Every structure is written in C-alpha cells, then in structure tokens.
Amino acid sequence: MYKRQIISIFIHQGYQWFLLRSYQVGDLTKVYPIARGTGPLITTFISILFLGVVLDKFVIFSILLLCFGIFLLGANNYKKSNLNEIKYPLITGVFIGSYSLIDGYGARISESAISFMSWSFLINALIFPFVLGIIGEKKVLQRVYNEGKKIFIYGVTLSYASYALVVWAFTKAPIPVVTSLRETSILLSIFIGYFLLKEKMNLLKISSIVIILIGVIGIKLF
C-alpha cells in the first residue's frame, strides 16, 4: 500500500505541474476539454490492455463516446492552438489517468480508502510548494497568499471532498467507469455558464451535452 501511496504522490506532483503549465500556455476553453477527455481514455486502455480488466464492449463504446463529447467542447479552439496548447493538456490527461489507476488500486487494498486518500492528499499538499520553488514558480504561491487565500481554502476543501468520493467509488466500481463518469462534471460548468454567467448556448455545446449524456446512459445501461 505504501509503495502505491508514494507513487501516487509523485504522479500528483506531475499532474499539478503540467496542469499549471497548461493554463499558463493556453486558455481554459482549450486546455480543459483536452486534459479531462484524455484521462478516461488512458485509464480505460491501460486497464484493458495491461491490467486484465474486462469491460462490456458497449461500456467501452460509451466511454469513448463520452470522451468525444468532452473533446468536442473545445473544437472551435483547436485549430487556433499551437503545439504547447495541445501537448501540455495531453500530458496532464496522462497523469490524470495514471493517478486514477494508482489511487484506485491503492484504495482497494488499504483498510480505509478515505485514509489512503487523505494521507496522500496531505503529503502532496505539503510537498507541492517546494516543487513550485524548485521549478521557479514561487510567484504562484505569492499570488495565492496576496490575492486568493479564501478561494484557495474553498478550492482545497471542495477538491478534497469531491476526490474522496471518487476514491471511495474506485472501490465499488471499475476504475475506468468511475473516471469517465467523474468527467461529466464538465456539464455542470456548461450549465453554470449558461444560467449564472449568461453565456450563450451554441450548437456545439448542445451537441456536446447530448453526446456526453448518451455516453453516461450507455455506461449505466450496460
């Protein structure tokens, strides 16, 4: 268990750095769909090809459909992207898939999934500021301290609570399925944008919502 916990911490460090780098080189509308859509694909392919996980072919198709729906959200922006705006989110997605697998299997063999996740979360949070210092990103910490303490606290709390539920779910269902359903949170961001921020609901967003929902229904049915 401890070996998986150590590996998990290192992978989370990589994920956080590449996510930070992704947002430095690209807009949210470009970065987010690529990173979140790649994670479930990595988890699914590794699980099937190397870990002996057996999934119904309709579930696999539904996962692929769901990921396509997520990728579709950023379709208008991809043609304007440079290599870094694609590369860093893709690598971020690889880390998402990797830590999902490590955390999932670590939680399954531990006495308490929440305890496994909590210790990893705490140690990861303590290490990351030093990583930022080493890679020359101290300004990020300074900005959080000067401008975003409340948002940081809210973000950490919500991040812990939501990922604790995900890790618990890893012990109850196939990891590729949980990872894929986790990414449906992107629908919430669309609805918040439409109802609260008064963003326009265009054909691309509607198509994305429909495809993602079909993927979710397919996963649940099969």
Model regions and ranges:
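Alpha-helical transmembrane segments of compact multi-pass small-molecule transporters, enriched
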Residues: 34-49, 64-65, 123-127, 162-165, ...
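Small-residue-rich segments of transmembrane alpha-helices in multi-pass membrane proteins
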Residues: 34-46, 88-101, 150-163, 210-222
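Membrane-interface interhelical linkers
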Residues: 3-26, 75-90, 121-155, 160-172, ...
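Helix-capping/transition residues at the boundaries of transmembrane alpha-helices
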Residues: 23, 50-51, 107-108, 170, ...
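Hydrophobic transmembrane alpha-helices of multi-pass small-molecule transport proteins
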Residues: 44-48, 55-75, 204-221
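Structural motif at transmembrane-helix junctions in multi-pass transporters
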Residues: 19-35, 108-115, 164-184
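Glycine-/small-residue-enriched transmembrane alpha-helix faces in small-molecule transporters
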Residues: 81-114, 126
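Structural signature of hydrophobic alpha-helical transmembrane segments
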Residues: 3-12, 51-67, 112-126, 170-185
